Every structure is written in structure tokens, then in C-alpha cells.
Amino acid sequence: MVLILDNDLKPLYFTLAIISASFLVKRAYQSTNIYDFFNIKKKCNPFPQSQSELVDLLHYQKRMVLNKTIVETLKFVDRKLFLENKNVENPYYDEPKPIGYNATISAPHMHALMLDLLADRIPMSNGVALDIGSGSGYVTACLGHLMGCTGRVIGVEHIPELIERSIESIKRLDSTLLDRIQFLVGDGIKGWKQLKYDIIYLGAAIESLQVARELIDQLKNGGRIVMPVGKSNDFHELMVVDKNEDGIVSIKSLGVVRFVPLTSKENQLNPKNKPNATKVTNINGEKTLIRCEIIPAPDSNSNNNIKEFENLINKK
């Protein structure tokens, strides 16, 4: 069969061909491999036994991470190296793990989701990132890998022992990352005012947008914060805070999550406080209850509160 094109329609066909080719090129660039390109679901181990299997599960099945650069980084930064007990059972399961000092390392799907949300704000070079409540150092290491050799990452943590352990974990992973990573002992709520940041990651829940204002002030124009927001014993909202090139702030809530609270060192080390997770965890063969209680639903006026805060912070 021979297809004869109407001369009047040739420009249209040519334009459509260019658009189709552009779509395929873009799809190929965004795809990590043939499974993404053709939108084929890859079979994944639901009980991952390695970092690679874990990231495949998050990427192909749970679809918590889509950006290919984030996928590559998550495969490079081995979660097991950052756990308190290197012999912990099921280190690659998608669940939070205790790391001591009443702190936890978040579930892998939360790391994946939050880093994915930051992906398009990571500069090609000379970027600066801030990791608040760096804890195990896992996300700090991921940010160090993502920012590249010209970038800089600041991790703020108020438990010195966790910082020491983070440094040792990164040394085992890739000691050259420490050339661009700096850990500081301090109160993460205040950030670190000596720098302005392209991206800010909060690994614990900040009480309110008002409390987060100091962090928003430290964001560069064109930058982004991803953070859980809410009171310590509530569910939290995962929020994305963007500052455009003119310095105008916009905020979006992406839904309900549950994190440990961003709190003082004294409160965190108080033996009456428990990690803010809601599940039974198997630790060294012994099942341990890590808090289980009825929690109020998030504020139904959330969108109104966000709009009010946007108006306040953008007021000239």
C-alpha cells in the first residue's frame, strides 16, 4: 500500500512527526531502561535482599521514585551501611528502623519520594543542599552524591554520636563524598544561616509553617524545601515549599505522612519518649512495639492555612 500525502497537509504531517520524535527522545531520556520506556512492569522481589532489589521495588512496583538520577543515587547509597546494627534482620525491607537515641531511619519509600520531589531543583554544578535532622546520614550521603563534586551539603544533627556514626558510614560507602559534606551539631529548626540553599530536606516533622519560616528564609530563589509538617503526636502533611526566581513563595500539601518530630535534644533523649512510628518491628529476633495509638486526622483547614501563610510571607 502506498500512502499519498495531500500537499496542503504535508506541513502538518511533518510537524506531527517532529512532535512524535521529540516525545520519544524525551521519554528515552527520562527512562532508566527499557521497562520505563515501554511502560512495562518489571517483576520485583516484595522482600528485597539487596539495595538494588529495594530500589527496583520502589521504582517499578511502588512507583515512589521516577527520576533516573535519583534511582541511580539510591542504588549507589547502600542503606545497610547506615543502620545502627549492621546485622539487623531484613535491612532492605521498606520500613523504618531504629538507629538509637530515640531516632529512626525513615522507610526507604519516604527517602525515595522526598528525593524525587527535589530532583528537578538540583543544580548542575555549585549547588548547596541542607539536610535537617540528618540522623543516620543516609540522606546526607544521597545529597552528596546528587550534588556532584562541585556541590556542598550541610547536615545538621543535635546528637554528636549520630554524626560520628554518619561519618563512619559514609567512609565505608565512598570517603570522597566527605569532601563535599559537612556535619554540624546544632538545632535543625534554625537551619544554618551562613548559607543559602538550593534544596532543603527535613527528615523529621516541623511543628508548623510558622516555625519553618527561618528555613524558608534560607532558601535561594528558585529553591525548594520538602518537609513533613505537624504537631509531634499527630499525623503530618508532606509539604513542598517553592521559592521562585522573584522570591515569591508557594506551598503545596501532598498528603498525610508520619515522622518523628523535630524536637530538642533533651526531649529526644527523654526515656519516656518513643520513636514516632506505628508498627511492630522485629529487632534482633525480638518483636518490639514502637508506639501504637489513635491519632487525630490532619487539620481539615490545611489549604486555608497554607494560603494565609503564603500571603503573610509574600507580603512586601
UniProtKB/Swiss-Prot annotation:
Keywords: Cytoplasm, Methyltransferase, S-adenosyl-L-methionine, Transferase. GO terms for cellular component: cytoplasm; cytosol. Gene3D superfamilies: Vaccinia Virus protein VP39. The keyword S-adenosyl-L-methionine applies. Its EC number is 2.1.1.77. It catalyses: [protein]-L-isoaspartate + S-adenosyl-L-methionine = [protein]-L-isoaspartate alpha-methyl ester + S-adenosyl-L-homocysteine. This is Probable protein-L-isoaspartate O-methyltransferase. It comes from Dictyostelium discoideum (Social amoeba).
